[in-house]
Amino acid sequence: MSVADIKKADIVAQFQRAQGDTGSPEVQVALLTARINELTGHFKEHMKDHHSRRGLLRMVSRRRKLLDYLKGRNPDSYRALIEKLGLRK
């Protein structure tokens, strides 16, 4: 399961810093969030899929590390990203 190319392009366009930017932490976090949300839906139906659950936990960990990096380097961008993605309540 992956994020469709069109959806991925929309996410990149929404969160990129400049034209052609696909590697900034904001874009990476947004793409990981989309994949995590898709997998979360998968687990509602396939509760015993432990191999995919390991991949999900790995993605969550990678997103956490990117968010920590962004929080240390650019707190304003971090807060805006959290708000936009709706990650904190």
Swiss-Prot record:
Top-rank taxon, per record: Bacteria
Name of the protein this chain belongs to: Small ribosomal subunit protein uS15
CDD domains documented for this protein: Ribosomal_S15p_S13e
Annotated source species: Bordetella petrii (strain ATCC BAA-461 / DSM 12804 / CCUG 43448)
Record function comment: One of the primary rRNA binding proteins, it binds directly to 16S rRNA where it helps nucleate assembly of the platform of the 30S subunit by binding and bridging several RNA helices of the 16S rRNA. Forms an intersubunit bridge (bridge B4) with the 23S rRNA of the 50S subunit in the ribosome.
InterPro entries with a match to the protein in the record: Ribosomal_uS15, Ribosomal_uS15_bac-type, uS15_NS1_RNA-bd_sf
Keywords: Ribonucleoprotein, Ribosomal protein, RNA-binding, rRNA-binding
GO cellular component entries: cytosolic small ribosomal subunit
GO BP terms in the entry: translation
